[in-house]
Amino acid sequence: MSYPADDYESEAAYDPYAYPSDYDMHTGDPKQDLAYERQYEQQTYQVIPEVIKNFIQYFHKTVSDLIDQKVYELQASRVSSDVIDQKVYEIQDIYENSWTKLTERFFKNTPWPEAEAIAPQVGNDAVFLILYKELYYRHIYAKVSGGPSLEQRFESYYNYCNLFNYILNADGPAPLELPNQWLWDIIDEFIYQFQSFSQYRCKTAKKSEEEIDFLRSNPKIWNVHSVLNVLHSLVDKSNINRQLEVYTSGGDPESVAGEYGRHSLYKMLGYFSLVGLLRLHSLLGDYYQAIKVLENIELNKKSMYSRVPECQVTTYYYVGFAYLMMRRYQDAIRVFANILLYIQRTKSMFQRTTYKYEMINKQNEQMHALLAIALTMYPMRIDESIHLQLREKYGDKMLRMQKGDPQVYEELFSYSCPKFLSPVVPNYDNVHPNYHKEPFLQQLKVFSDEVQQQAQLSTIRSFLKLYTTMPVAKLAGFLDLTEQEFRIQLLVFKHKMKNLVWTSGISALDGEFQSASEVDFYIDKDMIHIADTKVARRYGDFFIRQIHKFEELNRTLKKMGQRP
């Protein structure tokens, strides 16, 4: 192996914020200390089943062979080859199938063997152990009862530092390739663990003084600046923004990729980091910046992220949510409807792997709830199949929202919004019991204020649909409002129904002001004139499209029948 193993012997070499090695997790409570020591002994001296040893050795050999081949390709000044692609495919099979099956069989609710225990099996291969630890800690976060300890949260952070330093600080491209799915999961899990730690450190009620002191003395562990720095470094190293810019203009992205961006490892990590930044800025409540990081990605065209369905779903979820909070309802509805239709048509392919299905199914349910909110606040036509699903899931709640029930809005928002976080380290000397909820409560207040401003609009819309002309005073009387109050509400209606809407261009922030409201009006002196702008359904277009699809299918079947 030709990677610089000596550089990866100590964690301190990776990160300037290494904690003292003699730190232990003793709490002062004899029962807790005894439980911890038993757990430590069990993990240290556990007997590793023979099948797991064989799997680890095979996994290591596959990764080592790929790295050796990659070194050869780099020395020959080649970017990739069929041999590399085949070995990446083997790793993908191990990662998505073998690892999952063995986890289910041997480690369903318990950790995999520690890296130190399997190190002799892999010749203390530093790079492989970093990759193994990434999977090891991810499994603890996801499946082990009680979740990760404080020490494990810190160790996982250091392991990510090791991994990203290996990729970013190498003299030339790192001799490593991984499946796109694994690369996406690395970025996704990195942000998830940061999010989890941000909430964990705010809940001090059940923490010992020793744990709080340790958190207080290590403010740079899982610091928001470190996380942002990693994501931006991966974006810059890959030159992905420039590649996307050239790609969308019809050019060859390879021409501007640079030394690192030509390699799949850097290109895909850079791309996934853009989506990671979208997610991170959304969690921090900066929706404009969240969408701005995707300014070179054309969401309405099939692109690189289509290769990983979870990345595609995550992208649309956070873009749609950001649009919703920016009061760009028409864009939010378009984004949610598009991705829900995609999930509806491809859902069967996700059931082969449970963890993918669970993640996509959860975001699918959340996006249905967000779409229900958006359509209540801004009624417009969507795909019939999605509309039918929505009525089945949230028909009653949409009726209650139309009547102005704030409790339903709050319930659906709480269920479907991201888990917001604060980037600021709390004051450990005086942490409010609900401090971890403050970011969510702040975003809920912003959303609820907007709902309150539109509370009367649904009722006004239903009245306007009944008439073509009506004295302002008379319609105000129907609503138990004074004429002045009613005129204010009509102005609110005009204002809220006019949205900034994306029409063309690459940046999702671009757009022009439009109104898709099914009813419009103007006031002439004391008389309100109303026009129904609802467009009649064009059934002919639908049937023509279906006929073309049927003819294409018929031609395909005939060709298949002609094959020898």
Curated annotation (Swiss-Prot):
<dbReference type="InterPro" id="IPR011990">
    <property type="entry name" value="TPR-like_helical_dom_sf"/>
</dbReference>
<dbReference type="GO" id="GO:0003723">
    <property type="term" value="F:RNA binding"/>
</dbReference>
<feature type="modified residue" description="N6-acetyllysine">
    <location>
        <position position="465"/>
    </location>
</feature>
<comment type="function">
    <text>Component of the eukaryotic translation initiation factor 3 (eIF-3) complex, which is required for several steps in the initiation of protein synthesis. The eIF-3 complex associates with the 40S ribosome and facilitates the recruitment of eIF-1, eIF-1A, eIF-2:GTP:methionyl-tRNAi and eIF-5 to form the 43S pre-initiation complex (43S PIC). The eIF-3 complex stimulates mRNA recruitment to the 43S PIC and scanning of the mRNA for AUG recognition.</text>
</comment>
<keyword id="KW-0648">Protein biosynthesis</keyword>
<dbReference type="GO" id="GO:0016282">
    <property type="term" value="C:eukaryotic 43S preinitiation complex"/>
</dbReference>
<dbReference type="GO" id="GO:0005654">
    <property type="term" value="C:nucleoplasm"/>
</dbReference>
<protein>
    <recommendedName>
        <fullName>Eukaryotic translation initiation factor 3 subunit L</fullName>
    </recommendedName>
</protein>
<dbReference type="GO" id="GO:0005852">
    <property type="term" value="C:eukaryotic translation initiation factor 3 complex"/>
</dbReference>
<keyword id="KW-0963">Cytoplasm</keyword>
<dbReference type="GO" id="GO:0045202">
    <property type="term" value="C:synapse"/>
</dbReference>
<dbReference type="GO" id="GO:0016020">
    <property type="term" value="C:membrane"/>
</dbReference>
<dbReference type="InterPro" id="IPR000717">
    <property type="entry name" value="PCI_dom"/>
</dbReference>
<dbReference type="GO" id="GO:0075525">
    <property type="term" value="P:viral translational termination-reinitiation"/>
</dbReference>
<feature type="modified residue" description="N-acetylserine">
    <location>
        <position position="2"/>
    </location>
</feature>
<dbReference type="Pfam" id="PF10255">
    <property type="entry name" value="Paf67"/>
</dbReference>
<keyword id="KW-0597">Phosphoprotein</keyword>
<dbReference type="GO" id="GO:0006413">
    <property type="term" value="P:translational initiation"/>
</dbReference>
<comment type="subunit">
    <text>Component of the eukaryotic translation initiation factor 3 (eIF-3) complex, which is composed of 13 subunits: EIF3A, EIF3B, EIF3C, EIF3D, EIF3E, EIF3F, EIF3G, EIF3H, EIF3I, EIF3J, EIF3K, EIF3L and EIF3M. The eIF-3 complex appears to include 3 stable modules: module A is composed of EIF3A, EIF3B, EIF3G and EIF3I; module B is composed of EIF3F, EIF3H, and EIF3M; and module C is composed of EIF3C, EIF3D, EIF3E, EIF3K and EIF3L. EIF3C of module C binds EIF3B of module A and EIF3H of module B, thereby linking the three modules. EIF3J is a labile subunit that binds to the eIF-3 complex via EIF3B.</text>
</comment>
<keyword id="KW-0396">Initiation factor</keyword>
<feature type="modified residue" description="N6-acetyllysine">
    <location>
        <position position="549"/>
    </location>
</feature>
<dbReference type="GO" id="GO:0005829">
    <property type="term" value="C:cytosol"/>
</dbReference>
<dbReference type="GO" id="GO:0003743">
    <property type="term" value="F:translation initiation factor activity"/>
</dbReference>
<keyword id="KW-0007">Acetylation</keyword>
<dbReference type="GO" id="GO:0001732">
    <property type="term" value="P:formation of cytoplasmic translation initiation complex"/>
</dbReference>
<dbReference type="GO" id="GO:0033290">
    <property type="term" value="C:eukaryotic 48S preinitiation complex"/>
</dbReference>
<dbReference type="GO" id="GO:0001650">
    <property type="term" value="C:fibrillar center"/>
</dbReference>
<feature type="domain" description="PCI">
    <location>
        <begin position="331"/>
        <end position="537"/>
    </location>
</feature>
<dbReference type="InterPro" id="IPR019382">
    <property type="entry name" value="eIF3l"/>
</dbReference>
<comment type="similarity">
    <text>Belongs to the eIF-3 subunit L family.</text>
</comment>
<comment type="function">
    <text>(Microbial infection) In case of FCV infection, plays a role in the ribosomal termination-reinitiation event leading to the translation of VP2.</text>
</comment>
<feature type="modified residue" description="Phosphoserine">
    <location>
        <position position="21"/>
    </location>
</feature>
